């Protein structure tokens, strides 16, 4: 102890010129900073892959549709204009620039009559389908369909103009046609795909503004339905509400909504039901350059150019509302996404191909077969040609063939699995007929004698209300495959391709004839002569 005090005095002697006592004092009363303390996040339930609770079997089925055909007018639907039938559609709108959204209805595997049911226990397990193979067949030849507008708002050619145009007149619209952006698309999921487009938004403080003001824009998400228009090269937007002139784009989209698949939202969906996988190929270049006629709502600032002389055409600056005409360029069979099989081994989301609700959604876009057929009907027969003696019609036809390979899967219904599925979609357990069974009623019931008498209340039993379809307000091309399942995969083209790539062997159908035993040659005995 004496040595420790000695060393302390020696230290004080050498640091006598430095005041270190306040340092020791500060260290003795130091406290941590009173800044904000960040606590760890509250644990939340995780979304797991379907492979965690779905067991796959070695049972596969093939299912295919019939030849699916549709024919209509490529630009607009034709309605009956007679009195009383103004809303009846005589010829629908069928364009190569439309989405085809097929809603595939599958049979309930829990009601299947399997020859051997020993592979699962119906008391503790349920069966579901998993899509493992898909082939979308497209008929009809390759072709480019064009569209246009008989009164398109096109003022001047801004690409190869040899003179400066003057002021636009009252009406400078022209008849112009063009081809569109080239798109091939396939989306597979058990829920409808989600699209996005720009629509008219709501201004702040209910300020509607003055007539002619630019409307606010809002990105809108909506379900892609069968018949919705794709992005043709003019953007994904609501042309009906954002273009009042109805002359800025071709007639097939001037009053429509062009949607683009919202890949970002579907990819970030927690359960991954809308997008198992997708195939996409887009191609476009610009063919011509024009500008619009009309008053510019946002004029070019004066500091960006030097004013022209009053004596020439440059005294008035032309419209800077430039726009191009898109083009999808050449279509070839070498760049086709269709008429070939695709095998689903691992989906990009948590749903690895499980068809919840016994349904599947296949979304198809193919603008490489968008040929518009011209039909001509004779009104009056004469020896000389006259235009008035013939009527011209436009029609577009499409042909599809859908083939699938489904794998039978089973789910063991533990308490954790049922809780997870109920949180994901409560209707799944309802379809599996899980619920509390009410006890037998012990109350006294009333029974009337004359059930048809008008003196008593109606005795007809109210029919039970059927299950309401949550997608009844949407338009899909429904394809029923409930009676088109087959276990004989080798009898169908896609089934044979699946057996080949999976290394499986089809069950023999015919018994081979028993091979006959080889004849034993009898040696001749030598006879002495």
From Swiss-Prot:
Its main location: virion. GO terms for molecular function: structural molecule activity. GO terms for cellular component: host cell nucleus; T=7 icosahedral viral capsid. One of its GO terms (biological process) is endocytosis involved in viral entry into host cell. It is found in: Virion; Host nucleus. Residues 507-529 are annotated as: Disordered. Keywords: Capsid protein, Disulfide bond, Host nucleus, Host-virus interaction, Late protein, T=7 icosahedral capsid protein, Viral attachment to host cell, Viral penetration into host cytoplasm, Virion, Virus endocytosis by host, Virus entry into host cell. Self-assembles into homopentamers. The capsid has an icosahedral symmetry and consists of 72 capsomers, with each capsomer being a pentamer of L1. Interacts with the minor capsid protein L2; this interaction is necessary for viral genome encapsidation. Interacts with protein E2; this interaction enhances E2-dependent replication and transcription activation. Forms an icosahedral capsid with a T=7 symmetry and a 50 nm diameter. The capsid is composed of 72 pentamers linked to each other by disulfide bonds and associated with L2 proteins. Binds to heparan sulfate proteoglycans on cell surface of basal layer keratinocytes to provide initial virion attachment. This binding mediates a conformational change in the virus capsid that facilitates efficient infection. The virion enters the host cell via endocytosis. During virus trafficking, L1 protein dissociates from the viral DNA and the genomic DNA is released to the host nucleus. Belongs to the papillomaviridae L1 protein family. This is Major capsid protein L1. It comes from Human papillomavirus 52. The lineage of its organism: Viruses, Monodnaviria, Shotokuvirae, Cossaviricota, Papovaviricetes.
């Amino acid at each position: 102890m004496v040595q420790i005090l000695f060393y302390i005095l020696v230290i004080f002697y050498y640091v006598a010129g430095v005041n270190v006592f306040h340092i020791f004092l500060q260290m003795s009363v130091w406290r941590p900073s009173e800044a904000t303390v960040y606590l760890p996040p509250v644990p939340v339930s995780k979304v797991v892959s379907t492979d965690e609770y779905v067991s796959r079997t070695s049972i596969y089925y093939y299912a295919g549709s019939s030849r699916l055909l549709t024919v209509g007018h490529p630009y607009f639907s034709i309605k009956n204009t007679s009195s009383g039938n103004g809303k009846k559609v005589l010829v629908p709108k069928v364009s190569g620039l439309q989405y085809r959204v097929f809603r595939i209805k599958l049979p309930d595997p829990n009601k299947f009559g399997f020859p051997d049911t020993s592979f699962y226990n119906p008391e503790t397990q349920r069966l579901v389908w998993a899509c493992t193979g898909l082939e979308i067949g497209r008929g009809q030849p390759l072709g480019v369909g064009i569209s246009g507008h008989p009164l398109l708002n096109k003022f001047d050619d801004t690409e190869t103009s040899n003179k400066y145009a003057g002021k636009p007149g009252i009406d400078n619209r022209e008849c112009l046609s063009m081809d569109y952006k080239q798109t091939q698309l396939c989306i597979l999921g058990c829920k409808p795909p989600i699209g996005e487009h720009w629509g008219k938004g709501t201004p702040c403080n209910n300020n509607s503004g003055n007539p002619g003001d630019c409307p606010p824009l809002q990105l809108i998400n909506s379900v892609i339905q069968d018949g919705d228009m794709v992005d043709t090269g003019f953007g994904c937007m609501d042309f009906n509400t954002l273009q009042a002139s109805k002359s800025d784009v071709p007639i097939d989209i001037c009053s429509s909504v062009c949607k683009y698949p919202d890949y970002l939202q579907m990819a970030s969906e927690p359960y991954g039901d809308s997008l198992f996988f997708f195939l996409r190929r887009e191609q476009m270049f610009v063919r011509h350059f024009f500008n619009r006629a009309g008053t510019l709502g946002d004029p070019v600032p004066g500091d960006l150019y030097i004013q022209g002389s009053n004596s020439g055409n440059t005294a008035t600056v032309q419209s800077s509302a430039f726009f191009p005409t898109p083009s999808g360029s050449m279509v070839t069979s070498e760049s086709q996404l269709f008429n070939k099989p695709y095998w689903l081994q691992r989906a990009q989301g948590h749903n690895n191909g499980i068809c919840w609700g016994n349904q599947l959604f296949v979304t198809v876009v193919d603008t490489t077969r968008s040929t518009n057929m011209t039909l001509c009907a004779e009104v009056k027969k004469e020896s000389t040609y006259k235009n008035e003696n013939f009527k011209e019609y436009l029609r577009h036809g499409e042909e599809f063939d859908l083939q699938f390979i489904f794998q039978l899967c089973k789910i063991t219904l533990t308490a954790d699995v049922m809780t997870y599925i109920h949180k994901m979609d409560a209707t799944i357990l309802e379809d599996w007929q899980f619920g509390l069974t009410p006890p037998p009623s012990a109350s006294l019931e009333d029974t009337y004698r004359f059930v048809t008498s008008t003196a008593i209340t109606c005795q007809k039993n109210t029919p039970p209300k059927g299950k309401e379809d949550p997608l009844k307000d949407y338009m899909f091309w429904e394809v029923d495959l409930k009676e088109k399942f087959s276990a004989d995969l080798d009898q169908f083209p896609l089934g044979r391709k699946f057996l080949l790539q999976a290394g499986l062997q089809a069950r023999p159908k015919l018994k081979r004839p028993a091979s006959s035993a080889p004849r034993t040659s009898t040696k001749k005995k030598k006879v002495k002569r």
